[in-house]
Amino acid sequence: MWFLRETIFGELVEYFSGGTRQVDVEKLGVCTDNSNVELSSCPDSSFDDEKTNQVNSEGLIIVTWDGEDDPENPKNWPLWAKLVVTFDVCFLTFAVYMGSAIFTPGIQEIRETMHVGTVPVILGLTLFVEGYAVGPLIFSPLSEVPQIGRQKIYVLSLIVFICLQIPTALGSSLGVLLPMRFLAGVFGSPALSTGGASLADIWQPWLYPYFMCFWSLGAVGGPVLGPLLGAAMVVAKSWRWQFWLLMMISALVLVIITFFMPETSEWHLLYKRAKRLRELTGNPNYKTEAEIASSQLSKGQFAKQILVRPIILCVSEPIVLSLTIYIGLVYSILYLWFEAFPILFTTVYHFTTIENGLVYMGILVGSVLTVAFYFIYLRKVMIPKFVENKGKFPAEEILIISFPAAFFIPISLFWFGWTGRESVHWIVPIVGTLFYASGSFLLFQSMFQYLAAAYPKYVASVFAGNALFRSSMAAASPLYARAMFNNTGPSYAPVGWGSTILGVISCIMIPIPFLIYKWGLKLRSRSKYAT
């Protein structure tokens, strides 16, 4: 079965069995009897330059898809195969993202076991999220290398991620726990930095936004369900079982993606086709465009592309800088709430550890409701516009949905902060979190799609830089969250003024999508990176 053949399992079977993938040479019009003979001299060849491969000025034979309907092109895979890959990416993202928040219910028990203060223990959350920031700088560019692809990055990094949970669970000091948490964040990051690219590999542009929503739900579900599952482990066993559970869930994901996740990278699939043709014909001139481009990069240029370009884009491009700061603030609020929720619901409402884990479900409910609305918006507004204009319309129109979403964030913060008091039922502040879920979901969807449309040639660097700054902002937030809420009060609404500070900052950010909508085209016209 072709699907299993393209998975890691299939490649391992092929490698250890000594098998070689066969190529339909007649279909590609390849001359196999003499590696030095020009293709045009093969009398029985059915080669068609315009349909398949072309010879460039250097005599290299550029390997491409066999027409628009080539069955090996991931965009032409059957629907069931695309749905399986989508599920794999979403489940992988869910499992890895859960690794951050699953830690929080055990903070108190870890503090008592290791005889340290609260802030040093919170570093276990901070360093994990900081790993999200560093990892994409390494793994995102590597996944674009045609010789590597995405599949191997997912599997190998997840194996390391799973192994890191063992010393984390067995560790008896922060000297062991903290480095392991940071490394786990680094090796868990490919799902977050490359998952969207995997979906873009298989879905047509007018369908891609729908399935990005499911991936986003996986990214939301992980940190939302993490505290609940972590709390269950702390109550039933101990804090160490948070990491054993994370290891078991991740191991299940590893089994699934090993057997049921084929490679989706167009560059890597074409590279393998070119490699098979080289082996079959003995002609070294079969190359892909991506293979040629990557071979022209020196190690220094590749390192610059990995480490320097993402930072340059985030700092020098006003569009990228402003949206990165905005997204970073919205992302930080989630991790601030990992401290605010226990303060409010334990101090005011006297919730148990398990009940504290349940309060995050409001965010998940809000996200699911927003997805339903967003699907209608896509179907009625964006997709018809995309089809009517053949994909060519001002990228700034993608930001329209972010206009109301920008107001939802401060509404949520003021609501949550000042309804969290003993005289108000506990469900009321949880309802307030629904506005955050809705606002953050719509902001993330619109802003990431806009960045991809505005910087198509450098989208990997833009997203890597965004992940670096966004995750760094979020990583720092738990360190000052408890002090901010405890020191501002007041006693009858313990997260009131802290939430107000965040709400005011969110209000200051509201004009950003409006300004980019108005001036974005002019800013892009002055940029050497944007289109």
Curated annotation (Swiss-Prot):
Cross-referenced CDD domains: MFS_Tpo1_MDR_like
Keywords: Endoplasmic reticulum, Glycoprotein, Membrane, Transmembrane, Transmembrane helix, Transport
Annotated GO biological process: xenobiotic detoxification by transmembrane export across the plasma membrane
Glycosylation sites: 486
GO MF: fluconazole transmembrane transporter activity
Bilayer topology annotation: Multi-pass membrane protein
Cystine residue pairs: none
Signal peptide: none
GO cellular component: endoplasmic reticulum; plasma membrane
Family: Belongs to the major facilitator superfamily. CAR1 family.
UniProt cross-references to PANTHER family, sorted A to Z: FLUCONAZOLE RESISTANCE PROTEIN 1, MAJOR FACILITATOR SUPERFAMILY
Official protein name in the record: Transporter mfs1
Organism of derivation: Schizosaccharomyces pombe (strain 972 / ATCC 24843) (Fission yeast)
Source taxonomy: Eukaryota, Fungi, Dikarya, Ascomycota, Taphrinomycotina
Gene expressing this chain: mfs1
